[in-house]
């Protein structure tokens, strides 16, 4: 049976200040990704730090992470170790990040033949006390 693993690509360190009990990767070579996939934690973060890059460089880095993830998952499956990955892209905001560039790359490289069914924009960082609020017009 395939093990579910949540894999979060994070564009910057801001939100990572609130995570615990999981791996935080600052490298994404196949050996490091393999170790993270085989770790007991149900999730891990890959800090891409793409927020500070231009869009073209952010796309290149994201593609490198995705391709290494794909290769690592394929190699593990060939060894009988199957995963049901759930991919999450945690972008700081649509104003400071490279949306939809990074999402498009993730979809192209990890979305399979049909791509992902949907992506969700959630304008909140509950742990940091940030939630988008809409003012009423009353």
Regions found by a protein language model. Name each.
Residues 2-6, 17-20, 32-44, 53-87, ...:
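Cap/lid and interdomain-hinge subdomains that line or gate substrate/regulatory clefts
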Residues 22-25:
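Active-site regions of enzymes building and remodeling cell-envelope glycoconjugates
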Residues 14:
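Active-site-adjacent helix-turn-beta-strand microarchitecture at beta-sheet edges
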Residues 11:
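Globin-like tetrapyrrole-binding proteins
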């Amino acid at each position: 049976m395939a093990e579910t693993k949540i894999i979060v690509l994070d564009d910057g360190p801001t939100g990572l200040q609130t995570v615990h009990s999981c791996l935080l990767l600052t490298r994404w070579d196949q050996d490091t990704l393999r170790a993270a996939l085989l770790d007991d934690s149900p999730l891990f973060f890959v800090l891409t730090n793409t927020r500070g890059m231009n869009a073209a460089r952010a796309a290149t880095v994201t593609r490198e992470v995705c391709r290494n993830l794909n290769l690592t998952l394929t190699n593990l499956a060939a060894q009988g170790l199957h995963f049901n990955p759930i991919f999450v892209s945690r972008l700081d905001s649509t104003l400071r990040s490279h949306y939809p560039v990074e999402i498009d790359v993730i979809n192209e490289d990890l979305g399979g033949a049909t791509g992902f069914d949907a992506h969700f924009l959630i304008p909140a960082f509950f742990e940091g006390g940030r939630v988008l609020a809409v003012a009423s017009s009353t």
